[in-house]
Curated annotation (Swiss-Prot):
Enzymatic reactions: guanosine(37) in tRNA + S-adenosyl-L-methionine = N(1)-methylguanosine(37) in tRNA + S-adenosyl-L-homocysteine + H(+)
Natural source organism: Frankia alni (strain DSM 45986 / CECT 9034 / ACN14a)
Start and end residues of each stretch annotated as Disordered: 244-264
Main EC class the enzyme belongs to: transferase
Function: Specifically methylates guanosine-37 in various tRNAs.
Main subcellular location: cytoplasm
Record localization: Cytoplasm
Quaternary structure and partners: Homodimer.
Keywords carried by this UniProt record: Cytoplasm, Methyltransferase, S-adenosyl-L-methionine, Transferase, tRNA processing
GO molecular function terms listed in the Swiss-Prot or TrEMBL record: tRNA (guanine(37)-N1)-methyltransferase activity
Protein name as annotated: tRNA (guanine-N(1)-)-methyltransferase
Length: 264
């Protein structure tokens, strides 16, 4: 995969040289090219922004540098057309499914906006995707690009040492991931669940699935409605619902039995 990133702060993308994304580049699985948008300006001040029409605070990124940059990048490989991604709080929410979709693309171009955003005409002309990584506002699109690229890169063939790691991740099956444990067996008086030490792979799988369901119900109940559930899953959910009904606190509020009491 090739990924081009256009930004006015190229140094912001240095973390792409590290960890999984860095190793993917070393292996040739991923090629990342970072571009300074100011290279496509034509004035002595290398201006990339201007006041917004209609008034209001802040500045808007001008269309000319963006159009010149994207035109030149796209022309660098005439045989292919890149998928252009604009990180923005106004975009559709990013998810694991979206990462899987982008991981199938041979070429991505990320446009990192700043100030009050990029002139809407650039978005209308060039953007294939407008993506939001959450309901909050950042100073620019660079952090969102780092998030999206890492989520995508780890899905590329050979990037993870164990391909099962991606398959077992949170959201890969629509649920949050089950809790994980390692040595020592007992830490601060808390022992690793016996089933994980049993050597019974089927029992371990059942335990992890049940814990994933419990965790998802407690933290992201919206995901349960979208997940593909088996009869065994529904039995776990029925049991969880029954436990919650029996776990009323003195104030009348109901607390899930897996909720850790902060006073303990």
């Amino acid at each position: 995969m090739r990924a081009d990133v256009v930004t006015i702060f190229p140094a912001y993308l240095e973390p792409l040289r590290l960890s999984l994304v860095g190793r993917a580049q070393e292996r040739g699985t991923l090629e990342v090219r970072t571009h300074d948008l100011r290279a496509w300006t034509s004035d002595v001040h290398r201006t990339v922004d201007d006041a917004p029409y209609g008034g209001g605070p802040g500045m808007v990124m001008r269309p000319e540098p963006w159009d010149a940059a994207l035109s030149e990048i796209a022309a660098s490989d005439p045989a292919r057309r890149p998928r252009v991604v604009v990180p923005t709080p106004a975009g559709r929410p990013f998810s694991q499914r979206h990462a899987e979709e982008l991981a199938q693309e041979p070429w991505l171009v990320f446009c990192c906006g700043r100030y009050e955003g990029i002139d809407a005409r650039v978005i209308e002309t060039w953007a294939d995707d407008e993506i939001s990584i959450g309901d909050y506002v950042l100073a620019g699109g660079e952090v969102a690009t780092l998030v999206i690229l890492e989520a995508v890169a780890r899905l590329l063939p050979g990037v993870l040492g164990n391909s099962a790691s991606a398959a077992d991740d949170s959201f890969s099956d629509g649920l949050l991931e089950a809790p994980a444990y390692t040595r020592p067996q007992v830490w601060r008086g808390v022992e690793v669940p016996a089933v994980l030490r049993s050597g019974d792979h089927a029992a371990v799988a059942r335990w992890r699935r049940a814990q994933a369901l419990r965790r998802t119900v407690a933290r992201r109940p919206d995901l349960v409605a979208q997940a593909e559930l088996s009869d065994a899953d529904r039995a776990v959910l029925d049991a969880v619902a029954a436990e919650v009904q029996q776990a009323a606190t003195p104030g009348g509020q109901r607390r899930p039995p897996w909720h850790r009491d902060s006073r303990a």
